[in-house]
């Protein structure tokens, strides 16, 4: 049994996940937590796609897309799945949490809206870039595995910051490289 911050996953389950979902450890496996509990917390797909373009130029990547089933989240998911990166994407919205947790544990890095997936990822011990757009910064930096990115033009974030369109993909990319290297 591996103890990972607050969530425990058996080593065998982690290895089974690698086989079941064809997780290639020679690639950079990234969880993209594209969902969010409200529309003001969901960074637009174009920002994720811009980041995907930047990171794909220098590293072979596999993107695990974590989101819920509501229509706003599904729009973001489908826009990403219709991009040129669709073949490098694996949507998680049809899987159970029990199946998703070992996938997250196998990721090199998570990049998530301030959503349940950012909290799960950090609790699993996976370094997590939290995209803080509309909630207090403490929600995205209370864990040592969390690395917040805030909207351009802001020094901090709080409720009603309304910054989802001002998350800079270059900042995400720079932070990802810093963490991955």
Residue ranges, per PLM feature:
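Donor-binding and catalytic core of enzymes assembling or modifying cell-surface/extracellular glycoconjugates
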Residues: 47-133
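CheY-like receiver
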Residues: 20-21, 103, 175
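Nucleotide-sugar donor-binding patch of glycosyltransferase catalytic domains
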Residues: 119-181
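A short acidic, often aromatic-flanked loop/helix-cap motif at beta-alpha or helix-coil junctions
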Residues: 9-12, 96-100, 153-158
């Amino acid at each position: 049994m591996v103890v990972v911050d607050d969530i425990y996953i058996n080593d065998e389950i982690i290895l089974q996940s690698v086989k079941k979902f064809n997780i290639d450890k020679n690639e950079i496996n990234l969880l993209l937590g594209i969902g969010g509990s409200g529309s003001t917390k969901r960074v637009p797909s174009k920002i994720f796609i811009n980041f995907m373009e930047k990171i794909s130029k220098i590293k072979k990547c596999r993107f695990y897309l974590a989101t819920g089933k509501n229509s706003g989240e599904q729009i973001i998911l489908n826009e990403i799945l219709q991009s040129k990166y669709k073949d490098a994407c694996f949507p998680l919205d049809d899987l159970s949490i029990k199946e998703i947790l070992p996938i997250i544990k196998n990721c090199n890095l998570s990049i998530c809206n301030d959503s349940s997936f950012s909290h799960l990822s950090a609790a699993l011990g996976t370094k997590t870039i939290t995209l803080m757009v509309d909630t207090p910064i403490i929600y995205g930096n209370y864990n040592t595995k969390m690395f917040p990115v805030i909207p351009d033009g802001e020094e901090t974030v709080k409720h009603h910051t309304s910054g989802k369109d001002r998350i800079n993909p270059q900042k995400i990319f720079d932070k990802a490289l810093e963490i991955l290297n």
